[in-house]
Amino acid sequence: MSAQQIILDHDKWRKGLGGAPAGLAGQSDANAYAGLDLETAQFAASSFSGSSFTDTVFRHAGWTACQLDGCSFTRCNFEHIAMADCVFTRCAFDQAQFSQSSLRGCRFVQCTWNGMNFDGSDWRNVQVLECKGTNVNARNLRGEQVDFTNSYFEQLEFEGALLNNTL
């Protein structure tokens, strides 16, 4: 079954229209999606190239060892998502909600973050390299081994954040 079909089936399942919970493993995708409910969807060792997601819910989802290149996420809700060992390259995040998320071993390279929120999130070994953006907010963000090398953000507001054992 294609990655697209698995994703669309999960949306149907969440909306009570049949389908089945998504367990995407070792798949690849390059499609555009809008208005999907992918809450609790599990993605593992999958690659996305040029995929776009608009007004999509990823709450309580789990992503492990995924590769995303040139993808866009507009007005997506990633609250309580758990991501581990994922790499985002040249991806754009606009008005994305990542509150209460957990990022482990993730890397963002040459990505754009606009209107992002990371309230109450927990990061471990997260690299944000050569990224840019504006209006990135986080209250009570916690993180160790966080690296923002060569990244530039306007209106970056971290309140009560504790990164790399600093106040």
Model regions and ranges:
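Tandem repeat scaffolds
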Residues: 3-9, 15-167
